Regions:
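N-terminal accessory segments that position/regulate proteins before the catalytic core
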Residues: 1-280, 287, 349, 353-389
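Short hydrophobic alpha-helical module
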Residues: 203, 207, 258, 293-299, ...
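Small-aliphatic-rich amphipathic alpha-helix that forms the alpha element of a beta-alpha
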Residues: 200, 235, 288-290, 296, ...
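A general structural signal for short secondary-structure boundary/capping elements
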Residues: 281-287, 295-298, 334-341, 381-388
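Extended hydrophobic-aromatic, low-complexity segments
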Residues: 261, 300-302, 335-336, 373
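Short histidine-centered catalytic/ligand-binding loop motif
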Residues: 181-191, 301-314
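Hydrophobic alpha-helical transmembrane segments and adjacent short intramembrane/lumenal linkers
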Residues: 264-298, 305-307, 312-314
Length: 389
C-alpha cells in the first residue's frame, strides 16, 4: 500500500479557558487552561483533534509523492492507521476522503481559501433565533449590548478642508437606486406571474452574448461583471409561488433562458427555504429564492492556486445580487440577499459538492406584503410610510 498526506492541512493549537473553584481556594486565580491541537483539512467535514505523535508523523508525509507504507515501519504503532481512518493520510486506493482530496487538487484551490471556505459553513443554524435570544434583533439592542459602533463615515480631514462636489440632476436611474432596499415582508398568498419570473432571471442571470474560442472553450457576456469573464456562479431556484410553475427546485440555464427541473429535495420546499436562510423567516416567504452556487473549477481553471481567485468568486455573487435588486425594484418587486445561510443543508438537498459547486449566498424576490410586519431599513420612507422601528 502506498500513502501520502492530504493536499491541504493546517494545524491549530486551540485554547479554552475555564474556571476551577478548587484551584481558586488553593490560592490560584481559578483559571484552567486547556489546549488541544486540531488538524483542519478542507476536504473533511470537520477539524480533527490530533496528538503529538500523529502530528509529527503527518508532517513527515509528502502531499505530492506516494510512499510505500512499509517505509514507515519506524512510526509509533497504530499512527498510520489512525491518520488513514481520519482522512489526513490517504491510501492510493480511493476512498471517500481521497475523492474529496482529489477534487481539491484538480480544481487548483489555494490552500488558505479552501480552509476559509470549508471552516465557515453552517448546518442547522437558526440565526434569527440566536440574534433575538442575544437581544441583538434591533438597533437599540445592538447598541445596548455591544456599545456604539465605529463611525458610519471615515473622515480624513476637517469639514473646512473638504472639496464640495456639485450634485447631479436626479434621473430615473437615480430614483431606481434610491428605491432599492431589502424586502423583509413578502406577501404569503400572492403568486408571481411566470412572465415576471422570466424577466427577473433574464435580467439578472442570462447570457446576453457568447464568444467561442473552440467548442470546449466558451465565454459568456452577462449583465454583471465577473472575474476573468468566467461567470462561475450558477442560479439554483427554490420556487414557492409562481403561476403556472410547480413548486420545487430548478436550475437556470443562462444560454437557453430555461429552467431545468431538479430532483425533489427531501425537505418540503417551504421548510428548505427557511433552513436555507438560517431561520430568517422574513426572507423565507419570498415567492422565489435563488441559491448562488459557485463552480470554483470554472474560475480556478484560469486563476490556479491564486490568492485572489476566491475573492473574485465572492465578488461575482455580490455583483449578481445587486443586479437582481435593481431588476426587482424596477419591476415593482421586493428583493433580498443574505450570506447567513446553512450551506451544508442546501448542498445536501440540492446535491451540490461543497468543493466543486457550493452555496455562497441566497437571494430572493417577489411581491411585497401590504403591511410591514418586520422592520425594514428604509430611512427615507421611499417604500413604507411607517417610521423605522
Amino acid at each position: 500500500m502506498r500513502v501520502r498526506r492530504c493536499a491541504i492541512v493546517y494545524l491549530e493549537p486551540r485554547e479554552r479557558l475555564g474556571f476551577d473553584l478548587d484551584g481558586l481556594l488553593a490560592g490560584g486565580d481559578g483559571t484552567v487552561r486547556r489546549q488541544q491541537w486540531l488538524a483542519h483539512a478542507p476536504h473533511l467535514d470537520a477539524p480533527v483533534p490530533i496528538d503529538a505523535p500523529a502530528r509529527e508523523c503527518l508532517g513527515q508525509l509528502s502531499a505530492a509523492l506516494w510512499v510505500d507504507a512499509a517505509c514507515l515501519a519506524g512510526w509509533p504503532e497504530g499512527v498510520l492507521d489512525w491518520l488513514l481512518a481520519r482522512g489526513l493520510a490517504l491510501a492510493e486506493a480511493e476512498g471517500q476522503s481521497a475523492i474529496a482530496d482529489t477534487r481539491l487538487r484538480e480544481d487548483y484551490w489555494w490552500g488558505p481559501a479552501a480552509m476559509f471556505h470549508r471552516a465557515g459553513r453552517w448546518s442547522g443554524e437558526d440565526a434569527a433565533a440566536a440574534t433575538e435570544a442575544a437581544g441583538l434583533a434591533t438597533a437599540t439592542g445592538l447598541r445596548q449590548h455591544l456599545g456604539p459602533p465605529p463611525p458610519a463615515v471615515a473622515e480624513r480631514c476637517s469639514e473646512e478642508g473638504r472639496l464640495r462636489l456639485p450634485r447631479g440632476q436626479a434621473s430615473d436611474f437615480d430614483d431606481l437606486l434610491r428605491r432599492r432596499t431589502t424586502c423583509r415582508n413578502f406577501d404569503p398568498a400572492r403568486a408571481l406571474p411566470i412572465l415576471l419570473l422570466a424577466r427577473m432571471l433574464e435580467r439578472a442571470f442570462s447570457a446576453q452574448a457568447q464568444w467561442r474560442l473552440d467548442t470546449d472553450t466558451v465565454f459568456l457576456k452577462k449583465g454583471s461583471p465577473s472575474g476573468g469573464g468566467l461567470h462561475p456562479i450558477e442560479a439554483h431556484l427554490l420556487v414557492q409561488r409562481v403561476e403556472g410553475l410547480a413548486p420545487g427546485a430548478y436550475h437556470y440555464h443562462p444560454l437557453d433562458h430555461a429552467l431545468e427541473p431538479l430532483p425533489a429535495p427531501a425537505m418540503p420546499i417551504p421548510e428548505l427555504a427557511r433552513v436555507a436562510v438560517a431561520g430568517q423567516h422574513w426572507f423565507a416567504g419570498a415567492q422565489v429564492l435563488v441559491v448562488l452556487a459557485a463552480r470554483f473549477g470554472r474560475c480556478f481553471w484560469k486563476y490556479r492556486q491564486h490568492p485572489k481567485a476566491y475573492r473574485a468568486v465572492t465578488m461575482d455573487a455580490g455583483h449578481l445580487s445587486q443586479t437582481l435588486y435593481l431588476a426587482a425594484t424596477d419591476l415593482g418587486l421586493g428583493a433580498f440577499v443574505t450570506c447567513a445561510i446553512n450551506e451544508v443543508d442546501i448542498e445536501r438537498e440540492l446535491a451540490l459538492d461543497p468543493l466543486g459547486e457550493a452555496a455562497l449566498a441566497v437571494c430572493g424576490f417577489g411581491w411585497r406584503a401590504d403591511a410591514m410586519h418586520n422592520a425594514e431599513f428604509d430611512p427615507a420612507g421611499r417604500t413604507w410610510a411607517t417610521p423605522m422601528a
